[in-house]
Design a protein with these regions (language model features):
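Short catalytic/signature loops enriched in Gly
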Residues: 2-17, 30-37, 250-343
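The feature captures the beta-strand-to-loop junction immediately N-terminal to the Walker
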Residues: 62-63
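Conserved ABC ATPase "signature" region
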Residues: 93, 143-160, 213, 266-270
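P-loop NTP-binding/switch modules centered on Walker-like glycine-rich loops
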Residues: 188-191, 195-199, 203-281
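Conserved ABC ATPase signature
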Residues: 165-169, 173
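Helix-to-loop junction immediately C-terminal to a conserved catalytic motif
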Residues: 77
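Conserved ABC transporter NBD signature motif
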Residues: 85-93, 105
């Protein structure tokens, strides 16, 4: 288990937007029948979320499993088609991009996957894995082998091991290979989908430091997805909190950790362990009841109301908008109120 430590100071980022997502919706149909299929329901994986990511910053996307984080990542990469909504990259609408235009878009966006074991082809050498993007884009002949060696060295691996296979490396080393592959085409946005959750605690800090270093060196922008708020606190400039397909709170990291206003955010932060026993005993604890409702049939009004300790009648009738309610950043709660959880 990871623990909360003091985060690095939030650096100044460019005010220029790299990515803008507007009213993203992704419903997966549930069908019935074998020959004549008909839709009988839908999984509301992502249901009308909007956010932007500025150049050079790290936006943390947090929430429990099943909240829609990974689906959001795949929508941004256009690995899934939107049910509705709009995605812009550097001011260009890429919502319906296809063919050669979509290929050009995708070289600007790469992904680091959660599982360093399943995300690398066991039949390929490290040189082939890291160099595959260069081959696809016809760049291998122009110094591809040299580029692979440089990338391996940059992520802390010995270039002399480029002919080895993934099974000859540890989990942390495999994730370094995945990072090198993501850097091969010099992307502008890298989506980190739980990049350290499958690693030993002793290795996590090394990978997080590596991600921070290459971000500074190559002027990268990150969307960092995780369910572990103590990890996200170390890397994110801003946080967006998701619950059942909705963003319920979004703001600057220190604001959300210091004085969260949405009950769900408060419950998540209250669950982050503190390494100091005295502070751990003094902190406020919030226990949520029940399980996350089914995304096939989400609750009316506020989706969090079935587990919320502040829920009232209006919460079942009216869905709260994601707006600033006078607390400095947007939240989606009728009764949003700052709460200091850590003494």
């Amino acid at each position: 288990m990871s623990v909360a430590t003091e985060p690095a100071a939030v650096p100044q980022r460019s005010g220029q937007e790299l990515v803008r997502a507007t009213d993203l919706v992704k419903h997966f149909p549930i069908t019935s029948g074998v020959i004549l299929q008909r839709q009988v329901a839908a999984v509301h994986a992502v249901d009308g979320i909007s956010f932007s990511i500025r150049k050079g910053e790290t936006l943390g996307l947090v929430g429990e499993s099943g909240s829609g984080k990974s689906t959001t990542a795949r929508l941004l990469l256009r690995l899934l088609d939107l049910t509705s909504g709009q995605i812009e990259l550097e001011g260009e609408d890429i919502t319906t991009a296809s063919g050669a235009r979509l290929r050009n878009v995708r070289q600007k966006m790469q992904m680091i996957f959660q599982d360093p074991y399943a995300s690398l082809d066991p039949r390929m050498t490290v040189r082939d894995i890291v160099g595959e993007p260069l081959v696809i884009w016809n760049r291998w002949k122009n110094g591809g082998a040299t580029r692979v060696a440089e990338l391996l060295e940059r992520v802390g691996l010995n270039p002399d091991h480029a002919n080895r296979f993934p099974h000859e490396f540890s989990g942390g080393q495999r994730q370094r290979i995945g990072i090198a592959r993501a850097l091969a085409l010099q992307p502008k946005l890298i989506i980190c989908d739980e990049p350290v959750s499958a690693l030993d605690v002793s290795v996590r800090a090394q990978i997080l430091n590596l991600l921070a270093n290459v971000q500074r060196e190559f002027d990268l922008t990150y969307l960092f997805i995780s369910h572990d708020l103590s990890v996200v606190r170390q890397v994110a400039d801003r946080l967006a909190v998701m619950y059942l397909g909705k963003i319920v709170e979004i703001g600057i990291r220190d604001e959300l950790y210091g004085r969260p206003v949405h009950p769900y955010t408060q419950a998540l932060i209250a669950a982050v362990p503190i390494p100091e026993p005295v502070k751990e005993r003094q902190r406020k604890h919030i226990v949520l009841g029940g399980d996350i409702p089914s995304p096939v049939n989400p609750p009316s009004g506020c989706r969090f109301r079935t587990r919320c300790f502040k829920a009232q009648e209006i919460c079942a009738k009216e869905e709260p908008a994601l707006v600033d309610r006078g607390h400095g950043h947007p939240s989606a709660c009728h009764f949003a109120e700052p709460l200091a959880l850590i003494p």
